[in-house]
Amino acid sequence: MRFNRPHRPFRRTPSTTGGQHRKDPHQTQSAGPLASRRRRLLITSATVVSAVLVAVLALRDASGPEPGAAGSRADCRPTALLEPPCGAWFGAFVPHERDDLPEKVRAYEKRVGRELDIVYTYHDMSLASGTRREGQLLTPEERRVGEDHLLLLSWESKWWGGTKRQQPTWKQIAAGELDDKVIDVQARRIKDYGKKVFLSFDLEMDTRTPDNGTPADYVKAYRHIHDRFRALGVDNVVWTWITTGYLDHADEIKKMYPGDDYVDWVGYNQYNYYRCHEAGWLTFAQTQNATHDWIRANISDDKPLMLSEFGTAADANRPQRQAEWYAEVPGVLKGLEGVKAALQWNYRDPGPHCNLALANDAAWDSLRKAVSDPYLNQPLK
């Protein structure tokens, strides 16, 4: 499906942060007083084997779900806001044409050795005309994919390929000028779909000013869409607010947060662009840690977080470097407190040296191993 990317600044090498919002990936939970008392029980030699087994099981139950535990245990099932309590979702943006999304998703999954949890797609706000359906949320292909995946729908206030006059503005959206033909129509489509979906409005909004309006205009437009959905009885949307996470935009990002009552998840998109923006090579940790800590300190200290796009350019002089980068992902991810989803961007950005897709078999094999980690394999139901 065709889509336009907003201009995205690269992420400069971050300054050192205290890491106060990060957790030790190797930290284990306390067994609790009940388990400790049971361990202190005196048992007879005739029952030692069974008693030890009972104590071990009690210890596990008292500790709660183990970080990264997979399976169908009731306490690892997703919450009402689609949070996986025992780990994190793995998803991706998979390049596709209008009609072949299911096939492209299956091909990606075959290559990476597992099913995706979240499939990420993009839409504009154009009106349906003839065969055009870029503005149609939940296409037939998305519905097919959604039978056994979660969907993240990115909805942009654009008319791709349209005239300047056709481009929606945040002020128009906030004033309700798009309600009848756009907002209400798509709200009803989502309501009819029934299953919960992640929905993002104007991702990377900090790159869209002043062309689309002011930060205040964005907040009003976002809140209007949210309130309009609620008025129409749409209760199966998980509202996902996605910024670049580029810290030179920190003031702008803070102004564009719609508020805790309007946001369920907070996402950010950080990459190792390398030569794409003539930047130095950044590890996965360097692309994530500073932004993660800033968001926890300045936007929300408790909302679930999503690495809504992550990835790296390749290094032509060191073909193994991309593979080494992806190998770091599980270990770093476990230390990012509150991060409950990570979506790989398997495509390119505009510009020379800006192909962020997996470049070779070694990179694919590395990602395959990384996303086989139990932490990234959680029950969808």
Where are these regions (language model features)?
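Substrate-binding cleft of secreted/luminal carbohydrate-active enzymes
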Residues: T79-H96, V197, P304-K381
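Aromatic-lined carbohydrate-recognition surfaces of secreted/lumenal glycan-active proteins
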Residues: F93, D202, H226, R230-D251, ...
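Glycoside hydrolase catalytic-domain groove-lining segments
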Residues: G135-E156, Y271-A313, S372
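N-terminal substrate-binding region of glycoside hydrolase catalytic domains
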Residues: A80-L178, T312, Q344
